[in-house]
């Protein structure tokens, strides 16, 4: 029997009485986001809206973005990816379970040095899927656009991982699963974490280094395997 979404007590700043909100809304207030389902327009719009709000509320505190998703729409994934690049704050992306297809694309789009995986998580790279069906004319037009988007995504993967675009194209032609070590070597992530407390240390390192003009990727990459 499903237990539903748990509710927890939360007191809105300035209010004297606590109210009960679902656990995800409570975590949003702590700048923690979850992608735990198929990525469609509705889910993407919710995530984008929360990121815009958190960035406008405080552009000095980072966002932690947990991912356990089979992926989804190319347009939705590109929207979330673009927002991560657009906002001022750092976005730490964390794979737990599985980040497949466009979910792995979002994982790779996190702030450099802050793209993480738990030890038993997996990422999966493959060719993003497009829609089909309808009249022949529109199917041809859609096919051209799908090919354009796939090529765009391949180039962005290459940019985020440092892999040659030719290798990205080949690897996207089949389901390509990777454990943390392989994902790090490939460039999809920067670091494997074994305990959630490591996030605090990582955030402190990044915050300290930003005061000197940037994140020391070499130092962060040496932490873990």
From Swiss-Prot:
Its EC number is 3.4.21.92. It comes from the Eukaryota. This is ATP-dependent Clp protease proteolytic subunit. Keywords: Chloroplast, Hydrolase, Plastid, Protease, Serine protease. GO terms for molecular function: ATP-dependent peptidase activity; ATPase binding; serine-type endopeptidase activity. It catalyses: Hydrolysis of proteins to small peptides in the presence of ATP and magnesium. alpha-casein is the usual test substrate. In the absence of ATP, only oligopeptides shorter than five residues are hydrolyzed (such as succinyl-Leu-Tyr-|-NHMec, and Leu-Tyr-Leu-|-Tyr-Trp, in which cleavage of the -Tyr-|-Leu- and -Tyr-|-Trp bonds also occurs). One of its GO terms (cellular component) is endopeptidase Clp complex. The lineage of its organism: Eukaryota, Viridiplantae, Streptophyta, Chlorokybophyceae, Chlorokybales. Component of the chloroplastic Clp protease core complex. It is found in: Plastid, Chloroplast stroma. The active site is at residues 101, 126. InterPro entries: ClpP, ClpP/crotonase-like_dom_sf, ClpP/TepA, ClpP_His_AS, ClpP_Ser_AS. It comes from Chlorokybus atmophyticus (Soil alga). PROSITE patterns: CLP_PROTEASE_HIS (PS00382), CLP_PROTEASE_SER (PS00381). It is an enzyme of class 3 (hydrolase). One of its GO terms (biological process) is protein quality control for misfolded or incompletely synthesized proteins. Cleaves peptides in various proteins in a process that requires ATP hydrolysis. Has a chymotrypsin-like activity. Plays a major role in the degradation of misfolded proteins. Belongs to the peptidase S14 family. Disulfide bonds: none annotated.
